[in-house]
């Protein structure tokens, strides 16, 4: 009987580890804020800024309305500053002028976390330009700064939006887009099977045993 309670306790611990979101972030330069250009049909300004991130990463991006590029620094501190510049010609087509390069290693997918190609996404009843595109499975706030399919954020996103997801990060001027990932689909199915096994084990552990009576 004690063995069943031990198994149940282990199952609860594993379930909490699977479902609780992770607070570790190794991709600090992409957490919450973005310095890439942003434009939409109602946009009238562009943003450019400088990043100070870890020595392992550097980032530079061009403003959508000017040729000036943001400065990068190898300072060990993690900070961000944004300067707003008025745009002379801001429209939905201004994002075509934006350009960006990525170098360094903020995750295990070195050189693949950022795409300079600007894509369009329909968010909040309008089309917006997405300059930050994270490849399938990448999560800035996930475990190891890489694939966080077992954290609540990416797990729910990949389950509810299997073909990709675009959203506006809190405090950020730009939009972030996650692409579809067959690997994420497979991992999500495996995670669902594991959760189902844990639930069945909990039900069996706490279920009252049946008693049989024989008459002689």
Curated annotation (Swiss-Prot):
It comes from the Bacteria. Residues 28-115 are annotated as: Disordered. One of its GO terms (cellular component) is plasma membrane. Keywords: Cell membrane, Membrane, Transmembrane, Transmembrane helix. It is a multi-pass membrane protein. Residues 28-67, 89-108 have a biased composition (Low complexity). The chain crosses the membrane at residues 5-25, 137-157, 183-203. The keyword Kinase does not apply. It is found in: Cell membrane. This is Uncharacterized protein YxcE. It comes from Bacillus subtilis (strain 168).
